[in-house]
């Protein structure tokens, strides 16, 4: 591989086992990190606001829960796993006052460091450990003696051993069993945002909705359009997930593959590629981050409007009716109430 990859033999759990880790947040990643750290012999405290609904769950799982400020004061290593938009205030109010020399500040995503929303003091280590999978998978793989690949990055190495500490943390949550890839805060943040906006979320959702619209506007039944443009997408993505695009093409019919090869580049053409480059440029320049922070601080008016418009799209009502016919699909509470 062209990147540096670390495994179990490259990481020393001893670098973290003698120190206290505060996990700030107890959502998808927070619970997986905390429980796996504990099971790896690391002293863990959880930082949650007094009124957090996650406090009872963490306590039931045998973890000691403090306020974020109390956890930051007690810990040697502080892992922030709160949402991006909550991190700056959380850091300023609860963590910064207790971030004394020699401590380490860790992140699961580089957004706030990359865009200067958080500026740690120069006498602390700053690193990132980012599992490339949801928290439930991170935890399940750890319990099964396996692991989820992680990204690791060091932004600030005050101690001279920040990378070693980050690798020890990754090992404690199972990452080095699978492999830990070295990156930077900038690379992780920019590629993560681009993937979300241009491909995984924004690109895929827009492609599916537009395909549905083209078929229904041409007079085809919404139910059939839903199957062809959304439902069957999972079959294709699963094949890609298992073996890449080549595996998908090997597995589909020759008719489907010919249509893929001959028509796909007409849909996603050079103009689309240029617009994708423009999206990347907004990420690299900080334009997107500034826009999103301002939107959040203004109460998210555009976000709320766009979310409501998406929920009202005809594909949602059609999909709800069709999913009711599929006993194998776990339907959300909003569709089963």
Curated annotation (Swiss-Prot):
List cofactor names only: Mg(2+)
Record-listed E.C. numbers:
1.1.1.86
Q: Does the keyword Glycosyltransferase apply?
A: no
Q: Which InterPro entries match?
A: 6-PGluconate_DH-like_C_sf, KARI, KARI_C, KARI_N, KARI_prok, NAD(P)-bd_dom_sf
List, alphabetically, the Pfam families matched.
KARI_C (PF01450), KARI_N (PF07991)
Q: Where does Mg(2+) 2 bind?
A: 192, 228, 232
Residue ranges occupied by any KARI N-terminal Rossmann domain in the UniProt entry? 3-183
Q: Which pathway is it part of? A: Amino-acid biosynthesis; L-isoleucine biosynthesis; L-isoleucine from 2-oxobutanoate: step 2/4; Amino-acid biosynthesis; L-valine biosynthesis; L-valine from pyruvate: step 2/4
Q: Which GO terms describe its molecular function?
A: ketol-acid reductoisomerase activity; magnesium ion binding; NADP binding
Q: Which family does it belong to?
A: Belongs to the ketol-acid reductoisomerase family.
**HAMAP family assigned to the protein according to its UniProt record, in alphabetical order:** IlvC (MF_00435)
Q: What is this protein called?
A: Ketol-acid reductoisomerase (NADP(+))
Identify the species of origin.
Salinispora tropica (strain ATCC BAA-916 / DSM 44818 / JCM 13857 / NBRC 105044 / CNB-440)
Name of the gene: ilvC
